[in-house]
Amino acid sequence: MDANKMIINLAVLGKTQSGKSSAGNVLLGSADFYSRFAPGSVTKDCSLGRSCHIHGFMRRGGHEISLQIQVLDTPGYPHSKLSTRCVKQEVKKALEHHFGQEGLHLALLVHRADMPFFGQEASDSVQLIQELLGDSWKNYTAILFTHAEKIKEAGLSEEEYLCEASDALLTLLNSVQHRHIFLYERGNSWSEQRIKILERIMEFIKENHFQVLSFT
């Protein structure tokens, strides 16, 4: 293993049309995952993107460390064509296959900032994370808000948006120690935003002392 290289394993989970595949592409700086607007679910199978290599991303022990990001894209839950049982089995199998030995550093629960988070759909999202990650899910989950430009269009700051969030969303944020990230679809440089998001993800991982969630 290269001592000057670090591999970070991530998974994107969430509702259909929440922007999981698009978010995965931003993290990778590529187009590994097929993403388009559609009235129903687009992603039907899990797939691993690993095209992201950033040289000299950070320093450790006086040495520059290169970063490789691996992102597992997953079908939406609930899915417009697949049963809930099928989606759970597909994602669980993929987590075990891709991260069974190396482990998962962080799961990103993707949620559109311009959509409400409450009721049964909110419960389903949290339940999915709990079932897939087990009792330690709170330590390995962050919320990724997509379409964050809608917040500014509404005349709100990120802080004001969170203050006005539903009880269900606030409860979830409290559960994951307020680990959250905002992803802007417009008005920001993709490359700059990508680096900022990865730096924030690394902060979360450092807070976890680089521990991983194993699926063996």
Curated annotation (Swiss-Prot):
The gene is Gimd1. It comes from the Eukaryota. InterPro entries: G_AIG1 (IPR006703), GIMA/IAN/Toc (IPR045058), P-loop_NTPase (IPR027417). Gene3D superfamilies: P-loop containing nucleotide triphosphate hydrolases. It comes from Rattus norvegicus. Belongs to the TRAFAC class TrmE-Era-EngA-EngB-Septin-like GTPase superfamily. AIG1/Toc34/Toc159-like paraseptin GTPase family. IAN subfamily. Residues 5-216 form the AIG1-type G domain. Keywords: GTP-binding, Nucleotide-binding. GTP binds at residues 14-22, 35, 147-149. PROSITE patterns: G_AIG1. Disulfide bonds: none annotated. This is GTPase IMAP family member GIMD1. PANTHER family: GTPASE IMAP FAMILY MEMBER GIMD1, GTPASE, IMAP FAMILY MEMBER-RELATED. GO terms for molecular function: GTP binding.
